[in-house]
Structure formats: C-alpha cells, structure tokens
C-alpha cells in the first residue's frame, strides 16, 4: 500500500512542471482566456520559472557520496519544492508584472491583440522547450533570454 502511494507521489512530482507547461498550451488554445486574462498567463509563466529555478537549485547542491539519498528523501525534496513554489506563487517575485509590462510595450508598438502576442510568446516557449531538455543551467539562461524578446 505504501509503495503505491510513494510511487504516485513520485510520478506526480516529476510531471508537475509538465502540467504547468501543458496549462500554458491549453490557455493558448482557449481564445477567451488568453484575450481577457493575460496577467493570469504571465503568472503561470512566473510559476513555471520558479519551479524550474527551485528544482535546479536543489540539483546543483553538493551531495555527499557517503550519505545515500533514499526514494522517500527525493519525494520529500520534490514536495518541498512544490510547496515553496506555491508559496511564492501567491506573493509573486515581480516577474509577472515585468512580463505584463513587456507585453503592453510590445502591444503598443505593434498594435497587436493579446491573443496575437500570446501566440508569438507561446510559439517561442514551445520551440524553446523542445530544443533544450538536457542542460539545466542553459534552460534557466535561455528562459531569461526569452523574456527579453517579449
């Protein structure tokens, strides 16, 4: 019974970032949501960025060879990362505001609707996601570069 529970938790935490990524794609397909709630989309991008950042920070820490990590410890670390991400999601770190400001500047310059801007952004995010799946540090650096082009 307990192994099934831990397997469920482990699988659930591994695909958390994929779920957030898929939510972004679903929002792209839902035109009403993307037109009226661009701030919600930027909050989801901020949430995804925070989750990637926290998990990569944990991976970069030194691990002692004498202290082996058990499966339950990795589950706990993933759950802790999710909790910290959810805590920062409520308050935010200001990235969503920056994205909204960049979208407004871009929108004013190009006279585009929120849907057109989100299409351009999500297409960049999709190509970014499919091309870079192995290197964690490059993922964070390229994600930050992606925000410059909004």
Swiss-Prot record:
Keyword check for Nuclease: no
Any one Gene Ontology BP term: bacterial-type flagellum organization
InterPro entries assigned to the protein according to its UniProt record, in alphabetical order: Flagellar_prot_FlgJ_N
Keyword match rRNA-binding: no
UniProt KW keywords: Bacterial flagellum biogenesis
Pfam families: Rod-binding (PF10135)
Remarks, miscellaneous: This protein is shorter than other FlgJ proteins and lacks the muramidase domain. It may be degenerating and may no longer be functional.
Family per similarity comment: Belongs to the FlgJ family.
UniProt protein name: Putative flagellar protein FlgJ homolog
Source organism per UniProt: Buchnera aphidicola subsp. Baizongia pistaciae (strain Bp)
Lineage: Bacteria, Pseudomonadati, Pseudomonadota, Gammaproteobacteria, Enterobacterales
């Amino acid at each position: 019974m307990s192994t099934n529970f831990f397997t469920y938790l482990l699988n659930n935490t591994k695909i958390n970032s994929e779920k957030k990524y898929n939510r972004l794609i679903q929002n792209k397909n839902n035109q009403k949501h993307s037109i009226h709630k661009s701030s919600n989309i930027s909050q989801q991008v901020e949430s995804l960025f925070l989750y990637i950042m926290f998990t990569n920070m944990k991976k970069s820490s030194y691990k002692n060879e004498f202290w082996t990590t058990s499966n339950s410890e990795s589950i706990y670390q993933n759950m802790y990362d999710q909790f910290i991400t959810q805590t920062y999601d409520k308050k935010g770190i200001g990235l969503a505001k920056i994205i909204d400001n960049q979208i407004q500047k871009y929108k004013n310059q190009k006279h585009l609707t929120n849907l057109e801007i989100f299409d351009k952004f999500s297409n960049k995010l999709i190509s970014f996601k499919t091309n870079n799946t192995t290197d964690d540090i490059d993922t964070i650096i390229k994600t930050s570069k992606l925000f410059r082009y909004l």
